[in-house]
Structures are given as C-alpha cells and as structure tokens.
C-alpha cells in the first residue's frame, strides 16, 4: 500500500509535498504521514563517505577510496556476509542488493525485514505473496462485499487503505470485519464489526471468519500476523476455502518491492539468524538504512561482533558508529 506523492523543491529546499496525479491510487489526496513524516531533509545528513583510519576513527574520504576499501573487505568476507536492507529502499535498489549479494558475494543470507521474523512468515511470503500479481486494488476495496482485517489497523498503518474502506463502509457498499482484541477507533469509523480474539485465539477466529466471506471478499493481512503462530497459514487456508482475494499489507513502503526483488532469505539466514550469527558464521555485514530502533539492541551487538561492516545511511546512527565504511 502507499500513495503517489510529489515533492516540490526550490533552491535546494523542500517547499511542500502534494498528492501526485494518480486518482486511481489516492484520489489526489495524501495523508499527514505522507506529507510530514519524512526525516531526510533534517540537519545532520552525511555528505561524504567515511572510512575507519588506523586510530579507529571514522574520517571523510573520496568515493573511489571508500569503494576500494569496501570492496576489499567484502571480498574477504565473501559468502560469510549478511545483507540487511530494510524495507524502505526502492525496487531498483532492492534488485541491486539482491544481485550483488547472491551473484557477487555468493551469499543467500539476505533479508529486507527489519523486525522480528518467523519461519512461518518466510514460507507464507514465498508461497503466497512473492512474485504474485497485485490483484487487489484500492478500487476493489470499495466494491468488495466484505473486507476482513487480520493483524492490520488501517488508520495507523496505511491511511490510504483506511480512507477507501471508510468511504465504502459509509456508502454501504462494503462490510468491514476485524480480528482483534477490541474495537479500535479506526474500526468504529469504518462502522466495522469486531470478531473478538484474545491472545492465542487468533487462529480459531480466522478459521471462523469464513462465515463472513465470499468470492467477492478481500482479506487484508498485516505484518503483525507473523508473530502469531499459525495465523498466516490459517489466512492462506481461509482465502483458498472462501475464494476471497488475499493481500499482504506491510508497514514499510519498500517491503513488497524488496520481496519481489529476491530479498527474502530462501536458502539462507533470516534477519534474526544473521544477527545471531554475526562474528561467528557471519563475518561481514552490509547494512542499508536499517535503524537500531527497528531491532532494539540486536543490531548494534551484531555490528560490534562482525569482522567487517559496510553501512549505507543518511545520517549517523549506532550502526555507522561501529561500521568500517559508511556511504551517504
């Protein structure tokens, strides 16, 4: 999910962010998050490549020198390198990371998920989402007979989806159901129906939701479902049983593009496994735009343990503070 935006710049200064001319996506409207929630224009951005000198300090250097040092270090770690990209890179960058990791470094230890992950989620994404057509559009949400929300809060996680569902519900076109422990403010605004499910009750609630779905329905499942054992498999089975269309809605804008570009660790280690193996089986780390806050203390500990670390970032973090080479 996401919206089409344009950024107006004058004299190297961002003046405003407006909805792009793509009415089929966001009807020429963009949410407050899209308009204001971006930090890349704030002060403190990195402007030059940095390398660690003989005294252990990060110092500015030229691009050719930084590339030379990074290439030598990654060549040394080779297939024992883990690649973590985060979910905010473009499709083109995601593809470049994937090809570089698998064909140049010779590693399958790649993952775009900057959060807690599970084997069930990996299998679900590989079998039911990756390389599948995007057959659920924003317009489809307004014409669906019913929409089931599983581990997904549209108002908080995807305001454009919320706007469409609220619009459809107020017109009486679509009935919204949500599997959750309580009725959220967003669900109330969509005149939705709560299918109550407390801890360890989600899988049963998903199975029982079949009574509210038909082939004209849509199931929207959020990334939080991956933290409930059995939930994603139950969702896939529900979609197959009812004929409802299924859409996975992650929180980060680049997650789906990264998934389709090959940044799921098929045959390799997941994010949590890469971090746990840092300094052991995983000697090197290539990290692109993953914030320490996303993975609490695990990421910093892994960076400190690794033999060689390359970081691509917009500004200094605890990752860049411990990296051997930093690219802005």
Question: Which residues are covered by each model-predicted region?
Answer:
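Catalytic alpha/large subunits of respiratory electron-transfer oxidoreductases
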Residues: 1-328
């Amino acid at each position: 999910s996401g919206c089409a935006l344009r950024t107006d710049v004058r004299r190297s200064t961002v003046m405003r962010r407006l909805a792009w001319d793509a009415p089929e996506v966001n009807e020429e409207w963009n949410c407050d998050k899209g308009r204001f929630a971006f930090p890349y224009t704030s002060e403190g951005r990195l402007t030059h490549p940095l390398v660690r000198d003989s005294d252990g300090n990060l110092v500015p250097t030229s691009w050719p020198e930084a590339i030379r040092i990074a290439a030598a270090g990654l060549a040394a770690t080779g297939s024992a390198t883990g690649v973590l990209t985060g979910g905010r890179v473009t499709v083109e960058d995601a593809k470049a990371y994937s090809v570089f990791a698998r064909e140049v470094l010779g590693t399958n230890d790649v993952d775009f998920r900057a959060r807690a992950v599970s084997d069930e989620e990996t299998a679900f994404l590989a079998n039911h989402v990756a390389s599948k057509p995007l057959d659920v559009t924003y317009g489809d949400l307004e014409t669906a007979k019913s929409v089931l929300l599983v581990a997904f809060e549209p108002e908080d996680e995807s305001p454009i989806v919320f706007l469409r569902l609220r619009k459809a519900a107020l017109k009486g076109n679509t009935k919204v159901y949500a599997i959750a422990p309580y009725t959220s403010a967003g669900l109330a605004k969509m005149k939705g129906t709560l299918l109550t499910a407390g801890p360890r009750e989600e899988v049963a609630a998903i199975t029982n939701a079949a009574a509210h779905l038909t082939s004209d329905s849509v199931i929207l499942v959020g990334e939080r479902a991956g933290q409930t054992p059995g939930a994603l498999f139950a969702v896939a089975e529900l979609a197959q049983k009812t004929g409802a269309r299924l859409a996975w809605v992650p929180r980060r804008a680049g997650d789906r593009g990264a998934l389709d570009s090959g940044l799921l660790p098929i045959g390799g280690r997941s994010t949590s496994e890469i971090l746990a193996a840092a300094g052991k089986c995983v000697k090197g780390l290539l990290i692109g735009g993953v914030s320490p806050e996303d993975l609490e203390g695990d990421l910093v500990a892994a960076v400190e343990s690794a033999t060689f670390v390359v970081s691509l970032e917009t500004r200094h973090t605890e990752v860049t503070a411990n990296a051997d080479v930093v690219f802005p």
